[in-house]
Amino acid sequence: MNSFAMLFPGQGSQYKNMLSSFFQKKNNLFKKIFDEASEYVNYNLLNLIKNGAKKKRDDYKYIQSAILTSSIAIYQLWKEKNGRRPALMSGHSLGEYSALVCANAIKFSDALKIVKLRSKLMQKIIINKPSLVQAIIGLDKVIIKNICLQYLPKIVSIASINSDDQIIISGEKLAVREVGLKCKKKGAKYVIKLNINTPIHSQLMKPVSEQIKYLLKSIKIKSPQIPVINNVDVICEKNEKKIKKALVRQFYSTVRWKEIIDLIKSKKIFTMLEIGPNKILSNLIKKNDNITVLNTNNLKNFLIAFKTIH
């Protein structure tokens, strides 16, 4: 098996009772990692992923921490089994923090601090300004961008370019809805509302990004031991200050996911392993005929991936 890349998912990859097959095997490693994370965020994350939150606001507040912890637990199991080291890592949005933890650039506890604040700031934004996130399927990004610009000064941003035919838009609720309708008239195959209640990667997030910047000043980030392709510049940054600046910008900038996958392919890496509780990134990538896509959303697929990559 040649080199492979590890990919880490972001918000939206959660579902009730995720990772259940890992816990059915009485995996002490998973319990230990979830207990550790729960202590840091002062909330029972294990109960959250098993049963869901009793209060909706708790789900919004802690689900990002749960997704981060899920990826870290799966990666630690991979390491415990002496799994092969990837040539590259990258994470989609929130997943960039998972990648940096697994590359030994950020301590897990520090990543939880950042993600907890990230969640809090996202919720703060929607109190005064209802938001919406939609996927536009089958329409050129230039057309979508031009439609978004027509709605200024209302804010609708391209949140993520996931592939040639899947663009995510985010921003003020009514404006996003109108942009979606206009995209449909211009030829989009589908316009799909996503299960995300905050205006991710839109200019609405820029005013609160200073708080992320302030927190990052107190956090040590080392040069990643495994190269991590970042979301905003599509490069493997090594410098602490530059990594921090990119993380602040990521809060309100477009996730350039298609370019990240193209960069990985340009390095002659055609095997990609998703480390997380779902198959969202795998489903995005599998349309590439020349790429082998593996995932770890359950224990069976984890073991298949482990065997394939070895």
Swiss-Prot record:
SMART domains registered for this protein in UniProt: PKS_AT
Xref: InterPro entries: Ac_transferase_dom_sf, Acyl_transferase_dom, Acyl_Trfase/lysoPLipase, Mal-CoA-ACP_Trans/PKS_FabD, Malonyl_CoA-ACP_transAc, Malonyl_CoA-ACP_transAc_FabD, Malonyl_transacylase_ACP-bd
Pfam families for this protein: Acyl_transf_1
The UniProt catalytic activity note for this protein reads: holo-[ACP] + malonyl-CoA = malonyl-[ACP] + CoA
Pathway assignment: Lipid metabolism; fatty acid biosynthesis
Q: Which residues carry out catalysis?
A: 93, 201
- What does the record give as EC number? 2.3.1.39
Q: Is the keyword Lipid biosynthesis in the record?
A: yes
Any one Gene Ontology MF annotation carried by this entry is: [acyl-carrier-protein] S-malonyltransferase activity
Example GO biological process: fatty acid biosynthetic process
One GO location term (cellular component): cytosol
Q: Does the keyword Mitochondrion apply?
A: no
For this UniProt record, the keywords arranged alphabetically read as follows: Acyltransferase, Fatty acid biosynthesis, Fatty acid metabolism, Lipid biosynthesis, Lipid metabolism, Transferase
The family line of this record is: Belongs to the FabD family.
Put simply, this protein is called Malonyl CoA-acyl carrier protein transacylase
Q: What is the primary gene name for this protein?
A: fabD
